[in-house]
Amino acid sequence: MPAPHRLYPRSLICLAQALLVWALLAWAPAQASQELTLVGKAAVPDVEIALDGDDWRWLARKRVLTLGVYAPDIPPFDVTYDERYEGLTADYMAIIAHNLGVQAKVLRYPTREQAVGALESGQIDLIGTVNGIEGRLQSLRLSVPYAADHPVLVMPIGARRAPPADLAGQRLAVDANYLPRETLQQAYPQATLHYFPSSEQALAAVAYGQADVFIGDALTTSHLVSQSYFNDVRVVAPAQIVTGGESFGVRADNTRLLRVVNAVLEAIPASERRSLIYRWGLGSSISLDFARPAYSAREQQWMANHPVVKVAVLNLFAPFTLFRTDEQFGGISAAVLQLLQLRTGLDFQIIGVDTVEELIAKLRSGEADMAGALFVNAARESVLSFSRPYVRNGMVIVTRQDPAAPADADHLDGRTIAMVRNSAAIPLLQQRYPQAKVVTADNPTEAMLLVADGQADAVVQTQISASYYVNRYFAGKLRIASALDLPPAEIALATARGQTELISILNKALYSISNDELASIVSRWRGSDGDPRTWYAYRNEIYLLIGLGLLSALLFLSWIVYLRRQIRQRKRAERALNDQLEFMRVLIDGTPNPIYVRDKEGRMLLCNDAYLDTFGVTADAVLGKTIPEANVVGDPALAREMHEFLLTRMAAEREPRFEDRDVTLHGRTRHVYQWTVPYGDSLGELKGIIGGWIDITERAELLRELHDAKESADAANRAKTTFLATMSHEIRTPMNAIIGMLELALLRPADQEPDRQSIQVAYDSARSLLELIGDILDIAKIEAGKFDLAPVRTALRALPEGAIRLFDGLARQKGIELVLKTDIVGVDDVLIDPLRMKQVLSNLVGNAIKFTTEGQVVLTVTARPDGEAAHVQFSVSDTGCGISEADQRQLFKPFSQVGGSAEAGPAPGTGLGLSISRRLVELMGGTLVMRSAPGVGTTVSVDLRLTMIEKSAQATPPAAAAQATPSKPQVSLRVLVVDDHKPNLMLLRQQLDYLGQRVVAADSGEAALALWHEHAFDVVITDCNMPGINGYELARRIRAAEAAPGYGRTRCILFGFTASAQMDEAQRCRAAGMDDCLFKPIGVDALRQRLNEAAARAALPTPPSPQAAAPATHDATPAAFSAESILALTQNDEALIRQLLEEVIRTNRADVDQLQKLHQQADWPKVSDMAHRLAGGARVVDAKAMIDTALALEKKAQGQAGPSPEIDGLVRTLAAQSAALETQLRAWLEQRPHQGQP
């Protein structure tokens, strides 16, 4: 082991080397630094700080605080010139040094890193202009912030839209000394970062197109923009980064210095902080306040739905709105819109217009959402909604610089005054100076040109506009002569009526803008010729103020020592008082309902935040003022009334009072529960009143809505009762006749001849009941929107002739002349639903005959061509009793009737005919109008515009065509019939055989496709729902084969055939490639008609009409099926009937067995398909109960996932119905004569 004394020289050498390295490191920054003279605010304020004795002794020993700054400058925080250091940081450093009783020393370093190294080595005590992010990265301890640091985004003033929130694809320019790269990359990972040596260079890069977006702190950005780039860039949005504000940084171990610096900073009053901000021209910066107002949920939703708002502005309304030579929008309104953009996040798209009329038209048409600047007047308020005015300016008189020009307002009578067209001041001016002549111009420039050219003596304009135009365009020619005694003009934003959310958003945003900001914007555009003086112009004054401040500090130094002794005692009392006041403030402001306190003269002494929020005002606007003076209600008359009520209340009563009141605030009526409590002093003398209210508008509206809902429910119940009573009466009346007459007929002896008159009465009553039910169904269909017309080619003359023939006999019975008059020129056939048109005419003619006892009923038809259409009018006139106007208003309501003549008594019928007729005419696109007078008669006119159809030379009337149709076909079609249900297949085949067609049948889609490939068919009729290849797939495959290259056949006609009567079934068939859809069951005549239509479309031979069917047998029909349907389908062919029914019975029995097996296997899709098959079989014999059960089972089984008791019951019911149907069908067949019997 080496001797200890040999280690000493080596240890000393190492120690000496370490000291040398430390000295070199400390010497290097010291040599690089430059000492500057601190130039702070001239009048440095004294603040009360609480430090203990150790801190003051430490400061006495310290004597000097060294502040480190670095290049480049960060204005307005750091500004250096001529070895002087000033700026916002310098001002705060001067306050700290002054109040701590130490000297301030400033050392400037070339870089931030050198300044931080000097701080770590102890060469300086603190470093300025450090935000929270920088402090954390550099391991510094930061003081409380002395200035806000809101990062903001800046774009060129010509940018149309705000950048995307994540700045994706944007070139982001940033000061290298502002935010670390890691922070920016985390906030904007998709942006491209470009670092610059200073904020000014980074901002210039955006101004001149080298970068897209600049990010910097709000104060520095606002200072640079206002000083150098006001016309080039604008702040568009706050950045999504929180920095914590600008602070002083000290070493992490220097806690004492941090404590004393914080003590001074925290003691600086808010007024002094504002004064320092104003000192550097930042008091009205648009970048200092980014707090958004509290928007409601509906307002936030509106802004989310309308991110871009179109703003209409006048092209020349300087200095409010103007477009510079580079087409950039500017002016006072442009600056206000920038403020609103920051507070709303909306993107304003500017639309320039030339006149106020054009601007208002765009607002009302929706081409623009709002106006950027518009004078407020009563006429415009009737069509527009105005925001809070952001400029109020008096009116002035501008005249020529001529002794003969009017000197003031008293000399305007008899003079010619130029004004902007539609100016709000024109009626006021004409009222005040009736002898003056007013001429108008399109804009202020033209109005002033009229004065400059001698065409007018004076122009009346706002002071701001007048100053702007005179200074810039008419200097030396025009002058502002005097102010005008008219109400000040108000400039505001405007929207169309109904834009409730938008105008509320704008008002909230405007209220969040301080008056200082608005005043600064206005002053910037007032048109002053000279630039405001800078710091250099005030250097001597500032030095003088600093000297006076130091002298004042010496004079008050003696007072400070004395006051310190009292401060400690006072602070204890103040703290207790402040605690009590804070408790009272929280108690009052925390109450959600408005509360106020007024003295006995009605002046406001105290109010809570809820009161201010209700009226949207600040405390300064109401404190110390009466209700009329503050006028928060917006109506001076209402304000005076409320003030007088309050004074009367205090004078008359001393007891608390609680009452409900309706009050109108800013045009809105609110229902409130108001309370007032007079209060006095300890001697009982009245001092004022405490009051407040609870807004119960929503509760009152809910009660009103509940009452309205009850009234609506009662009305609906009464209507239901009336309807049921009417229906009961209308149904029971014919039923009484039917039952009574049939009962009498049954009571007659069997060998006696039947009473034909009784049977006729029963028959007529049954027809009346059938018409009633039909009318009710028509009304229900029309009201449900499910009533479809079926327009076809119709001979116009045939419609009225049919109505005349129908009612001719009834008219003869009543001795009434029934006349048809036609005036049809150039119109033959039209496109109309003949059945429904005949229904309308029958109702009108029948009503006319019903209410006419003598005279005549005239049906007049007039038709004239109108382009490609025809204007047709049907008019029914009678000489009956007539109808009063009151009764006419009721006639077109369902079940409404009016009496006939006094002798005739009540009118027969249901009261549905006219209601149905009017609705049918409206569905046809026409109108039905009634004109009538009591004792004169009634005329009902139907006006229609119908499509004309050219009449073919070979056209044959329908009746003649029917007669000319041969009984046997000359040429038949080749028809492929596909159905997996054998009764349906057999029936359709027999029907087509009867029509003379050549039929090939297939019981599956696969078999049909094979037959279609082997043979050529003209028509294919396929069931839609089949196992395997269903009808839709079969149609698609046939159409695909026809579309293939080399297909040599003629395209066949494809019909779907289905028992599903859903409204969209025909659409599904056409979508699959079919030509049309047929619905089961279908009669022979209907089948022939559809084949005729298909043959005509495809140019196929037209199938002939069948021979007339044999008369139907009138055997009694069992309840489970319809014998009439069977007879109609089979044309009363006995052999076909028996063959059809045997096949139905056999197939139903097999389908029921298969259904039960599938039900046991829980194969629900196949259960649904089998139910559909059973429904199709039931439709053949019109077994309604079985059809309903099968359809219900089909619907229930679709999508079923597990066992269902309801399906179990439906399967059992369907099986029982099938068995009952088989029994009844066999019994019915036994009753019929066999073929060959007589």
UniProtKB/Swiss-Prot annotation:
Under the heading InterPro entries, the entry gives:
BvgS-like_periplasmic1 (IPR049870), BvgS-like_periplasmic2 (IPR049871), CheY-like_superfamily (IPR011006), HATPase_C_sf (IPR036890), His_kinase_dom (IPR005467), HisK_dim/P_dom (IPR003661), HisK_dim/P_sf (IPR036097), HPT_dom_sf (IPR036641)
Q: Which reaction does it catalyse?
A: ATP + protein L-histidine = ADP + protein N-phospho-L-histidine
Per UniProt, residues of the HPt domain are 1133-1228
Q: Which residues form the PAC domain?
A: 652-708
What protein name applies here?
A: Virulence sensor protein BvgS
Q: Which Enzyme Commission numbers does its entry carry? A: 2.7.13.3
Q: Which residues carry this modification: Phosphohistidine?
A: 729, 1172
What PTM annotation applies here? Activation requires a sequential transfer of a phosphate group from a His in the primary transmitter domain, to an Asp in the receiver domain and to a His in the secondary transmitter domain.
Please provide one cellular component term from the Gene Ontology annotations of this protein: plasma membrane
In the record, which positions carry 4-aspartylphosphate? 1023
* Protein purpose: Member of the two-component regulatory system BvgS/BvgA. Phosphorylates BvgA via a four-step phosphorelay in response to environmental signals.
Which residue numbers delimit the Response regulatory domain? 974-1095
Which regions face the Cytoplasmic side of the membrane?
33-307, 564-1238
Q: Which UniProt keywords apply?
A: ATP-binding, Cell inner membrane, Cell membrane, Kinase, Membrane, Nucleotide-binding, Phosphoprotein, Signal, Transferase, Transmembrane, Transmembrane helix, Two-component regulatory system, Virulence
PAS domain residues? 580-651
Species, as recorded: Bordetella parapertussis (strain 12822 / ATCC BAA-587 / NCTC 13253)
Its localization reads:
Cell inner membrane
Organism domain of life = Bacteria
Any one of the GO BP annotations: regulation of DNA-templated transcription
